[in-house]
């Protein structure tokens, strides 16, 4: 039950970050971590990463 609550909270945070307030600095930070593979981060990519993390833990 707690995993479900945490999942919804994390999705809310990811949605807030993806709304444009944090999207640009976050995209630049990830692009800096992966030279030559700069990509724009979409909200669905973040949700997919969250779901994969929840499944693996």
UniProtKB/Swiss-Prot annotation:
Tissue and organ expression note: Expressed by the venom gland.
Record flagged with keyword Cytoplasm: no
Leader peptide range in chain numbering: 1-23
GO molecular function: toxin activity
Main localization of the protein described in the UniProt heading: secreted
Family: Belongs to the formicidae venom clade 4 family.
Protein name per the record: Myrmicitoxin(1)-Pm7a
Organism: Pogonomyrmex maricopa (Maricopa harvester ant)
């Amino acid at each position: 039950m707690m995993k479900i609550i945490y999942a919804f909270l994390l999705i809310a945070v990811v949605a807030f970050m993806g709304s444009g307030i944090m999207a640009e600095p976050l995209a630049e930070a990830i692009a800096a971590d992966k030279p030559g593979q700069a990509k724009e981060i979409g909200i669905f990519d973040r949700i997919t990463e969250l779901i994969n993390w929840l499944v693996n833990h």
